[in-house]
């Protein structure tokens, strides 16, 4: 049975790529905001949600850490997607015709070298896939986009240069969300299980220290922890 997977962004977003890699036969459901992507799972419009929570270069993603606890959804798995940017333009364009590179502001910051080498002027767009769509619709051979290979396929753009990102270890961690609890997706069933906890401590000295001490005495490894003020 085909499952629907919601994600934030336009068709061709890296989140859609992640959804298709985890669920190859899924029906991707693009949503304009993270709130909409989470609501689609809560309301039953989607079986799962594919949500990015942190990037190896840019750090954690927006307000996700605030939205997830309030969503009431269950994290049933995670997926690490290597982020590979393609420099793309309309058919007939080439490296001598392009003058601008359009993409999300974070993506532009992760592709500085190629823009400097080609003397391209950065243009900020709402998201990576959206920049590919806009370039495609413009028909302008002087405009290029930095987006996923999937976006180039969807919007019928030619890839002028492949994998142009500054750092090859650029990776985004996604969590897979479900309205109902499920067994963690470990493949063979023998992998390490990761648990995500959200808790609040009292506003007293050493409260966090004492809370974390419980993990130490139980020999529980903490992969990461973050604190937020109320």
Task: Give the positions of each predicted feature.
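N-terminal low-complexity segments that are often proline-rich with Ser/Thr-Pro
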Residues: 228-230
């Amino acid at each position: 049975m085909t499952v629907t997977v919601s994600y934030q962004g336009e068709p061709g977003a890296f989140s859609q790529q992640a959804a298709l890699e985890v669920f190859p036969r899924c029906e991707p459901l693009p949503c304009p905001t993270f709130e909409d992507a989470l609501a689609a799972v809560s309301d039953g419009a989607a079986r799962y949600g594919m949500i990015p929570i942190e990037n190896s270069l840019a750090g954690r993603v927006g307000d996700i850490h605030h939205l997830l606890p309030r969503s009431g959804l269950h994290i049933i798995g995670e997926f690490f997607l290597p982020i590979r940017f393609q420099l793309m333009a309309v058919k007939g364009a080439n490296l001598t015709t392009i003058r601008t590179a359009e993409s999300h502001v974070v993506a532009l910051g992760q592709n500085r070298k190629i823009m400097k080498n080609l003397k391209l002027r950065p243009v900020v767009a709402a998201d990576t896939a959206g920049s590919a769509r806009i370039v495609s619709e413009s028909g302008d051979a002087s405009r290029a986009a930095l987006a996923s290979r999937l976006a180039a396929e969807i919007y019928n753009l030619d890839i002028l240069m492949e994998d142009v990102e500054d750092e090859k270890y650029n990776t985004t961690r996604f969590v897979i969300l479900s309205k109902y609890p499920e067994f963690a997706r470990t493949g063979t069933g023998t992998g390490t299980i990761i648990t995500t906890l959200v808790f609040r401590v009292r506003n007293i000295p050493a409260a966090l220290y004492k809370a974390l001490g419980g993990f130490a005495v139980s020999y529980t490894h903490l992969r990461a922890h973050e604190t937020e003020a109320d």
